[in-house]
Amino acid sequence: MKYLVVASGGPGFAYPEEALEVLQSVILPSFKEILSLEKRKKIIAGGIPIGERTIVFIAEAISNDELDQMLRKLPMWGELDWEVTPLQTFNGRVKQERQAVKELKNIL
């Protein structure tokens, strides 16, 4: 299954020391894991919208549970707001639309 994953928000930084700590202990390790997931084809595509504090990617997982575990392993998991949308395949949608056409033709 494919999922659209959007992570946004997160803590602001009041002091440079705080920014340094969060960057070193949360942000950079999270990106390291994201790059690893991308290399293992668990993240198919993604990136960061220019000028935003948001991460967007398409993830591949066998189940909702697998994706949940994958996201929870990211150090930034508890720091950001996550929105996950399961994606229907184009092929699956075509089958549904063909069935709808068939049913409508039977009615008419």
Region spans (language model):
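Conserved, structured core segments of small domains
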Residues: 1-108
